[in-house]
Swiss-Prot record:
Species of provenance: Rattus norvegicus
Protein's UniProt name: Exocyst complex component 5
UniProt modified residues of type Phosphothreonine: T122, T395, T405
Pfam families named among the record's database cross-references: Sec10_HB, Sec10_N
Biological processes, Gene Ontology terms: epithelial cell apoptotic process; establishment of planar polarity; exocytosis; Golgi to plasma membrane transport; negative regulation of apoptotic process; non-motile cilium assembly; protein localization to plasma membrane; protein transport
Function of the molecule: Component of the exocyst complex involved in the docking of exocytic vesicles with fusion sites on the plasma membrane.
Amino acid sequence: MATTAELFEEPFVADEYIERLVWRTPGGGSRGGPEAFDPKRLLEEFVNHIQELQIMDERIQRKVEKLEQQCQKEAKEFAKKVQELQKSNQVAFQHFQELDEHISYVATKVCHLGDQLEGVNTPRQRAVEAQKLMKYFNEFLDGELKSDVFTNPEKIKEAADVIQKLHLIAQELPFDRFSEVKSKIASKYHDLECQLIQEFTSAQRRGEVSRMREVAAVLLHFKGYSHCIDVYIKQCQEGAYLRNDIFEDAAILCQRVNKQVGDIFSNPEAVLAKLIQNVFEVKLQSFVKDQLEECRKSDAEQYLKSLYDLYTRTTSLSSKLMEFNLGTDKQTFLSKLIKSIFVSYLENYIEVEIGYLKSRSAMILQRYYDSKNHQKRSIGTGGIQDLKERIRQRTNLPLGPSIDTHGETFLSQEVVVNLLQETKQAFERCHRLSDPSDLPRNAFRIFTILVEFLCIEHIDYALETGLAGIPSSDSRNANLYFLDVVQQANTIFHLFDKQFNDHLMPLISSSPKLSECLQKKKEIIEQMEMKLDTGIDRTLNCMIGQMKHILAAEQKKTDFKPEDENNVLIQYTNACVKVCAYVRKQVEKIKNSMDGKNVDTVLMELGVRFHRLTYEHLQQYSYSCMGGMLAICDVAEYRKCAKDFKIPMVLHLFDTLHALCNLLVVAPDNLKQVCSGEQLANLDKNILHSFVQLRADYRSARLARHFS
C-alpha cells in the first residue's frame, strides 16, 4: 500500500502513473529486451494493484464520511453560538439607546443651565469692566495716574488695552465739558502707541519674532498699526541690496519676508503686498529711471536694449512673486505695479523703435556702399524710363549704354544678416514691450521697415543695377554677372522668408494683419521674381548672342564644302568646340546660381534657344557629302553638350536635329526611307525638304522629286 501511495506523486498524470507501475514490476518494462518481458507477471501485478486501490478507496471514503459528520456537528454548534451573540447584541443595543437618550437629556439641561449662567455672568463682567474703566477715567479726570497698569512698564500690554477702550469712550463725550480729560487720554494713547512701535522696532532688530508678534497684536487696534507695518518694511530692506543685481536682491528679500511675515502679523498677505509695492514704487522705479533717462535722448540703441532688459527682468521678478499669497487678484496687482514703472517709456516705445530701426538700417546700407566706393544712383521709374525698359526687354536695340559694374552684384550677405538681426531684435522687443492689442500693428510696422531697406533699398536696387548692367545681345565677350545676382538674391530670399515665418508670424497669426503681411510679402516676391525673370531672359539672349559671335567668327563655308573631299579629317569643327566650351561654362554657372525647379526651367529655355540657334546656323550653309559628315559630327557634339542640361526635351530636340543632319549624307535612293524613319516621320515635310535643299547635289541628283 505504501508503494501505491508513492506512485501518487503530484502533479498526477494517469499515463505516467501506469508507466511508473510497469517500470517497478519485474518483467513488465523494456529492461532486458523482449525475452525478459513477462505478461502474466504484469497481469498479476495489475490485478493486485487494483485490489490495493479499491481498499485504499474504501479507507479514504470512510475518512471523508467521518470528516463530513464532524463538520456538520461543528456547523450546528457555530450557528447556535451566533444566535446567542445576536440576542446579546440586541440587548446591548437597547441599553445603548436608553443611555444615549439619557445623555441627550442631561446635555440639554446643561446647555440650558449654561445659558442661564452666561446671562447672569455677562452683565456682571460688563459691570466689572465698566467699573474698572470708570476708575481709570477718574484718574485721568483727577490728573493723577495711580493704577499699577499705568505705572508698571511691564504691564504695557494691559495699559494699551485700557487706553484703547478709554480712547473710544472719550470720542463719544462732549468736547466742552470733557476737553481736558479727552486731551489727556489722547496724549496717553499717543505715548503708548509710540512705546509699542519702539518696542516692535527694537524686537525686530534683535530678531525676536515672538515679541514682534505680541506687540503687533496689541497695535492691531491702534491707529498706528499701519505705521508699525511701515517700520517693519523699512527695516526689512536695510542691508538687503548689497549685490549688483537689484532684481535678485528684491526676490531674495521677498522670499525671506514671506517666510517670516505669517509668524508676526495677523494679515500677512497685506503686509507682503505692501512690501512688494514699496520695492516696486521706490527702489525699482528709481533704478529704472536712473538706467533709462541718461540714454533716452542720446543713445536710442542702448535705450532700447536697456528698456527691454529691465522690463524682462521686472516681469521675471513678478513671475517669482506670483508664488506668494498676495490676496485674491495678485496678477492684476503685480501688472499695475509694472505698468506704474514703465508706463512713460512704453507709451512711445514703438516710435523710438521705428526711428532707431530706420536710422540703423540706413547706416548699415550706407556703410556697405561706402566700402564699395559706390554712390547709389536713383532708379528711374515711370514715363520714358519705363518705355525704354520695355523696348530693351523685347528687342536688342541699344537704348543708351549699359552700366559697367565691374562684376559687382551690390548684394551682401553680411549686410542682409545685419539687417535681419536688427529686425529680429526689434521683433523680440516688440513682443515683450507692446500692449497685446497693439502688438500686430507694431509688428507690421517693423516688417514694413524690413521690406523698405532689405527688399527695396538693397535687393531691388541690386536687381535694377544688375538689369542695367546686362549688355545688349550683340555685345562681344560680355561679362554676364547677373547670374551671380540671381544666386545671392535666392539665398537672401530664403533668409527673408525664414525670418518672416519664425519671428513675424507668431506675432500676427491671430490678427487681421496676417493677411496684410502675407499680401505685402507676396507682392514683394512677385516683383522681385519678375525682375529676376527679366534679367535671366536678357542674360540668355546675351549668351545666345555670344554663341552667334563665336559661330560667325569661327565657322567658314569651306568647313562643310571642302575643296579637297579626299583629304578631310572627320571631326567636329573649331566653331563647334568653342561653342560647346562656352555652353558648358554657362550651364555650370546656371546650376550654381539657382536651385530646384528654377534650374530646370532656365536650362530648358537656354536649351531651346541653343537648339534654335544651331538649327538656324546649319541652314546657312551648303553641304557636300564630306561636309555633311562634319555637320553630323558637330551636331553630335552639340547633342553631347545638351546631355549636360539633363532636360529630356532639350536632348530630344538635338536627337531630332542629328537625325535631320543624316539627310545631308544619305544616298539619294534611301532618302525617302530615312524621311519616314521613327525620328523624322512626325516632322513637317517642309522642314525635311529644307534640310535636303542644303545638299550640294540637290539639283544634280534631282532630290526635289522625293517631296513632290
